[in-house]
Regions:
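Positively charged
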Residues: 1-139
Length: 139
């Protein structure tokens, strides 16, 4: 279901609780909402009012991917970036990495399975932005 975006700082600044397999409907709402937005590349669940650690992003082929409980384990190639956000006004200057390794859970057959994956460049920046949202960091 497509949800309205939330810009309430009280919601966005609240660290997200760990997600479970029972949160699959939240993940689906996140994907539906992301796909409905023009020029959007990623969303975190708190941006649709759900304080669960779930993020979704679109790859270069516009295919949606969902990460439950994402955590950046380490990064390489630090750089300064200027980012905008769908639920915040203005541009924020942030520190990012060109390459990151992320631990996350993936929903497989109704169960969360632990995964690790490397992300580079644009996808790495998106994931870092979404992980900041999960921590309640306002960008």
């Amino acid at each position: 279901m497509i949800k309205e975006l939330v810009s309430d700082e009280a919601v966005l600044s609240t660290p997200c609780a760990a997600a479970t397999a029972d949160d699959a409907p939240v993940a689906q709402d996140l994907v539906d909402t992301l796909k409905s937005l023009d020029d959007a590349a990623c969303l975190a669940a708190n941006q649709i009012g759900e304080t669960k650690a779930i993020v979704a992003y679109l790859d270069d082929a516009d295919e949606a991917h969902v990460l439950y409980n994402p955590k950046v384990l380490f990064g390489m190639g630090a750089f300064k970036a200027e980012e905008s956000c769908l639920t915040r006004e203005g541009i924020a200057k942030v520190n990012r990495f060109v390459k990151i390794k992320v631990a996350f859970d993936e929903l497989v057959d109704g169960e969360l399975k632990p995964r690790k994956r490397d992300f580079v460049e644009w996808e790495a920046e998106l994931i870092q932005h979404m992980c900041d949202h999960c921590k309640g960091k306002l960008i």
